Structures are given as C-alpha cells and as structure tokens.
Amino acid sequence: MKTNRLVFQKSGALAQWSRFSFENQELIGTEIPQTLEMMHKNDARSARIGSDGLPTRRGRRPKTIRGPLHIQCNGHGDLKYLNQLVDEVLTWPYIESAQPFISRSNTIPIRLTEMAASSDPSAFITDREFARILLGAPTIYLVLPLPCAHRAIVRGWAEPHYLGSQGLMPAGTVVVYTPKDVEELAVCSVLFSDSYHLGRKID
C-alpha cells in the first residue's frame, strides 16, 4: 500500500509533523491518514488506518480523576489544538451538525447520523455517539476498537474510562489526553478516525 503522510491545512504544521516523523522511528513507513484535508473532501474512508503506527507519547501522563465523571486535571496545553480537532471532526461526512464552537455547552457529543451508524452498541458511548468532549475540564472520551485502545493506553495517549471497567460503557472507551501541540493533534486525529470508522456501517 502507498504510504500517506498527514497533511494539515495550516501552514507550518506539515513541516513540524515531518520533522517529528523522522525523529520517531515507529512512524516511518506507516500509513498516517491525510485526516484534515481528505476528510474535508468527504474521503474519510480512504484516509483511515489502524493505530499500530502510534509513537510513544513523550512526557508524563496528565493527572486525572477516575470516577463516573472521569476527567483530565492538568497537562491540557493550548486549547486551540483541542478546538481545531473538534472543528475538523465536525466537518467529516455523516457527522451530525453542531452549533459553532463559541456557542457550545460544556459537553460536545459527536454522533454519526442515523443512516451511517452501525447497530453495534459496543461502538458508542450513547446512541450513535462515538466521542464526547468536556470543555469545563478539557477531556476527550472515545470508543476505540480494543486493539487500538490497548495501543493508545500502552503508548501513553490514553487510559481506560472508569465506567468501561464497571461495564457501564463499552470496553474500548478511553480517556484520550488532550493535544498540547501539532504533533499530538496528529495522533488524536488518528484515534478519532479509528473511533469514527468503528461506528460506521457504510465503510
């Protein structure tokens, strides 16, 4: 298969990601989806890969509070990266429309449209909702395929959601640490893509 590298719409981001990929050998030779541009062109399907090429996250894991409301307490970085991630995901095909970012509430559920969502409940937090972003204490919830969830946890990008361990959310539900820079934004885009395709019935 032809190797694709992640392409960002913002100037300068691609150059930073290119340097990062050559500094992290796990990324070289792996398929990194052209997430932001390709999905904006309604070509999310061809942008999709697995997460087996995830690098190991640098630095310590953020502190979290584990409980029914499982939240990330620190290490958020500049929230412009989280905002950019959310705004991009909301442009993907078959995502239900949402209000502009400035008018959103403290919780942003990201759902597939009814026509696109699979009937598998293990792919969703609630009905057709594969991702949820908390803004009060910035936190990302994603439902991932189990192998992908395992890799994201082991390589430092996520931790199991408390309610998943209690059987109240799908086993692949994780708390993904919010991106602090363009490199982490790229990895979060890969994880969102895996979650998005897990719930789609029309891939």
Spans of features found by a protein language model:
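Charge-rich, low-complexity N-terminal segments
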Residues: 1-103
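Hydrophobic, Leu/Ile/Phe/Ala-enriched alpha-helical segments that form helix-helix packing faces
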Residues: 85-93, 152, 195-202
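Active-site-proximal segments of catalytic enzyme domains
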Residues: 102-107, 121
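Short, conserved beta-strand/beta-arch hydrophobic-aromatic motifs that form part
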Residues: 110-162
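Well-ordered alpha/beta subsegment
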Residues: 164-203
